A protein has these predicted regions:
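C-terminal segment of classical bacterial N-terminal signal peptides
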Residues: 18-25
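N-terminal cap/lid segment of alpha/beta-hydrolase-fold proteins
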Residues: 58, 64-132
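Short beta-strand element of the alpha/beta-hydrolase
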Residues: 134-142
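Short beta-to-alpha linker loops that shape the active-site pocket of alpha/beta-hydrolase fold enzymes
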Residues: 143, 172-176, 249
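Primarily recognizes the serine-hydrolase "nucleophile elbow" in alpha/beta-hydrolase
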Residues: 190-261
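Serine-hydrolase catalytic core
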Residues: 269-277
Length: 277
């Protein structure tokens, strides 16, 4: 009798352990669909979004903070013309996560992040494609110095391109005070390096990729696509096959003195760009 009870106890413990292991999968599979009226807190609390690692704090650095934004709806948080596309994209992020896709990838190595913690925020968010040729696009949103476009043009455009069958990556790069030594352009270069080095894993071809940039992201894509010393050649990667820039800063020279006076005085060095760009 004792032997039988022991076997029952062991069986119960094993079942309990299996149940615990399956909880994250079960939780992600029971993720809710998002709408324009979903709040930021509801989005961030969703199991699939949590598991995905997708960055959703795109306006909190503007001074209003988490408490102000967390109960705002996606309609209030996102740009009016992009709300529907961005909401659909977040539903796609959740769906991909439920299907076992690793959405978030760190661009810099753990050793590099340990040496410079600001590098930890540099991430790629992946939307796997279906096209047989494996062409991919890298979307680089704007940032307005204190807020990023990851939940606006970044994800909205990525989802639309993904609908067309392309593999798409959205780049989250350093902004505000973490952009010394021309950090954002370095982040873009390293992101392309990362995709190139992991092309087989992502099922993409390393050549003939497209860069799609908006605002400051458009400026970065333009600089990277050039043959200058700060362009793609500096990172030993193929030249972009296509360059699409939306409302970019084409010539930074006009606003460089103002930017330098506002952002750089305490650092005693150029921050967002090289002095000869």
């Amino acid at each position: 009798m004792r032997s039988w009870n022991y076997k029952l106890l062991c069986g119960a413990v094993c079942l309990a352990q299996l149940a615990c292991l399956s909880l994250p999968v079960w939780a992600a599979q029971n993720s809710a669909a998002f709408t324009r009226q979903t709040t930021l807190q509801q989005l961030r609390d969703d199991p699939a979004i949590k598991s995905s690692g997708y960055y959703t704090y795109c306006r909190e650095l503007s001074g209003l903070g988490d408490e102000y934004w967390k109960n705002k709806t996606l309609e209030q948080y996102m740009r009016p013309e992009l709300v529907d596309d961005s909401v659909a994209a977040m539903n796609l992020v959740a769906e991909n996560t439920r299907n076992g896709v690793q959405v978030t990838w760190q661009v810099y190595s753990p050793e590099e992040v340990a040496a410079d913690s600001s590098l930890g925020c540099v991430q790629l968010f992946w939307f796997p494609g279906t096209n047989a040729d494996g062409k991919y696009a890298l979307v680089v949103g704007g940032n307005a110095a204190m807020k990023s476009g990851d939940l606006n043009e970044g994800i909205a455009v990525a989802a639309k391109l993904n609908e067309m069958g392309y593999s798409v990556f959205v780049l989250r790069y350093r902004i505000l005070w973490d952009i010394s030594n021309n950090g954002p352009l370095q982040d873009l270069g390293r992101a392309v390096q990362f995709i190139t080095n992991h092309a087989q894993q992502f099922g993409v071809q390393p050549e003939n990729y497209a860069l799609v940039g908006f605002s400051s992201g458009g400026q970065l894509c333009g600089l990277f696509s050039s043959d200058k010393r700060y362009g793609y050649k500096a990172y030993d990667v193929p030249k972009p096959g296509a360059l699409l820039m939306g409302y970019p800063v084409n010539d930074f020279a006009e606003i460089k003195p103002v930017y330098h006076a506002v952002m750089d005085p305490a650092s005693c060095r150029w921050r967002y760009y090289w002095s000869d760009i």
